[in-house]
Regions:
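Juxta-kinase regulatory segment immediately upstream of eukaryotic protein kinase catalytic domains
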Residues: 1-21
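Protein kinase glycine-rich loop
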Residues: 22-27
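Active-site acidic catalytic loop and adjacent metal/ATP-binding pocket
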Residues: 29-38, 44-45, 183-230
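A conserved alpha-helical element in kinase catalytic cores
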Residues: 48-94, 116-119
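Conserved short submotifs of the Hanks-type protein kinase catalytic core
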Residues: 93-106
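Active-site activation/catalytic loop segments of kinase-like enzymes and analogous catalytic loops
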Residues: 229-264
Length: 266
């Protein structure tokens, strides 16, 4: 990605002539992000990974995720891609781009997470779930009910000639439990898919930007249908972690109390 390419994108979207060199923002795992200043303002430009975008459903999924973000932006603090000519995903010279208004802020992680942050996240999550939005083209998930060949894996491991067999012995000892747990997961999935809402689905600390005490939800690529209480448990594990692998009860309570203002927990 060079200056000329970004300048072409910004001009094509009528966002102004670029001032100075774009600055790469580190931290993205799959895509590249740049801070770009133009005569009209400051923007974050996401350059989508070209290899990922070759996948058959990648463009459709990305478009749907931004439709979800845009709809939620009416009710919760969301950083959604700018819509230009009715599109949030823009193609230029074979590459795909998303452009966002720049927001000053940073993600926070344990041990810098406090009750206030947890209460904010619980409140936002509860609001999202209570809205129960519908987006054309986004369909509920089917249950993932794969029973894995755990016994086959054990026999394959035994045939590898592994010298350190400590883990293999533990695997064999736990084999019946593992098979039973797998069955229970499949049964639980059949129940969970009966109650689904559209949500963010990846609300861990790296996907929330904080400007002072104000949160903004970013990176909506994973957005879609999920069981609300399954996501609540995932969010609790993300945000109530004390940084040492344990859950802080006061943080747990803050999330649940705020969430319960919008969703029934009885």
């Amino acid at each position: 990605m060079n200056f000329n390419q970004i300048n072409k994108v910004m001009n094509a979207l009528n966002l102004g002539e670029v001032i100075g060199e774009p600055v790469e923002v580190k931290g993205g795992l799959l895509h590249k992000m740049f801070r770009v200043c133009t005569l009209s303002g400051s923007y974050a430009v996401k350059v989508l990974n070209s290899e990922i975008m070759k996948r058959p459903t990648a463009l459709k999924n990305t478009i749907n995720s931004e439709k979800i973000a845009a709809l939620f932006a009416n009710s919760i603090p969301v950083v959604a891609a700018l819509t230009v000519d009715g599109k949030q995903i823009h193609e230029k010279d074979g590459c795909y781009y998303m452009v966002f208004n720049w927001i000053d802020g940073k993600s926070i992680f344990a041990p810098d997470i406090y009750e206030m942050h947890c209460a904010n996240i619980g409140d936002i999550l509860g609001k999202m779930h209570s809205l129960n939005i519908i987006v054309n083209g986004v369909v509920p998930e089917e249950a993932e009910t794969s029973l894995y060949e755990w016994e086959k894996y054990l026999q394959l491991a035994k045939g590898q000639g592994i010298t350190d067999k400590t883990w293999m012995e533990q695997y064999e000892k736990s084999l019946n439990d593992i098979i039973e747990w797998n069955k229970q997961v499949c049964e639980a999935q059949e129940v969970l898919v009966q109650n689904q809402v559209i949500s963010h689905r990846d609300l861990d600390p790296k996907n929330v930007m904080w400007n002072n005490d104000d949160p903004f939800l970013i990176d909506w690529e994973a957005a879609g249908y999920v069981n609300p209480y399954q996501e609540l448990l995932e969010v609790i594990n993300y945000w109530a972690d004390d940084g040492k692998g344990n859950l802080d009860k006061s943080y747990f309570d803050a999330i649940v109390k705020a969430y319960g203002k919008h969703m029934n927990l009885a």
